[in-house]
Amino acid sequence: DYQAYAANLDKSAYSGNDLGASYSKKATTFKVWSPNAASVRVNIFEHGSDNEGDAGSIMSRAMSLDKTTGVWSVTINGDLLNKYYTYSVTHGKTTKETADVYAKACGVNGQRSMVVDLSTTNPDGWENDKHVLVQNQTDASVWEISVADFSSSESSGVSEANRGKYLAFTEEGTTVNGVQGASSTCVDYLKKLGVKYVQIMPFYDFGSVDESKNIMDQYNWGYDPVNYNCPEGSYSSNPKKGEVRIKECKQMIQALHNAGIGVIMDVVYNHLSLIHISEPTRHAQ
């Protein structure tokens, strides 16, 4: 019953920072906190969705429960870099397949998580990237923007391939309609105004946009999160590659910092895209 279920949650606690997939070339350890599950398996895939190549898993491993912490874990030997995975979680007689809520990378539409080495997603100069700070709070002029809205117009002066995407922020010298001497657009416009921070509307992975289709043919602000810790794929040049969306998101942040503009990430943990709490991989379309 609910009381027993909740009581078991209360007595299980884990303060570690290694939930998700911890990668090395020799092995990857998977950990997920699910104290009330009867069993958990991790399934490894070559691709991020059923629509790419062989849809079947290449391996599946049972995970072991630490009853003290409520953490299920398993270590798989070998190099799993950029392989995709899901968990099969059993509660009672029901088994659901789900992405990893702790994942930092995922495949198209967030249906499968991805094993990632974050150091390989760093753009050139990332080690020198720093937060933008102001001396006084009153100096913090903040503009709210959407990644898609920021450059989606044909008049933005941004190259067609980058319109509505992370990489639009990396283009310098953009003007209205690309006309030399015309008014500045995008990041150059923000610099001209003296904006110190941008609060970017959700750019975590959200469910209302089909990442396999052109972002210019769809629209949503993104307040329906699927994977809180993965960048949205529709804003990347290749949503099928989990590492690409991370690198290009970093490039956006780096470009803004280089322009003297700080970045505030709009995150809404009280919003969900789930149709039903027992269907973790299903989300509203």
What are these regions (language model features)?
Residues 1-29, 57-58, 66-173:
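The feature marks proteins involved in alpha-glucan
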Residues 152-171, 193-244:
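Aromatic-lined carbohydrate-binding/catalytic grooves of carbohydrate-active enzymes
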Residues 41-43:
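Beta-strand signatures of extracellular beta-sandwich domains
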Residues 34-39:
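Short proline/glycine-enriched turn/loop motifs at strand-loop junctions of beta-rich domains
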Residues 275-285:
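Single conserved hydrophobic/aromatic residue that forms the stacking wall/gate
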Residues 141-143, 198, 263-265:
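Hydrophobic faces of well-ordered beta-strands that scaffold small-molecule active sites
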Residues 32, 87, 145, 200, ...:
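Conserved, mostly hydrophobic/aromatic
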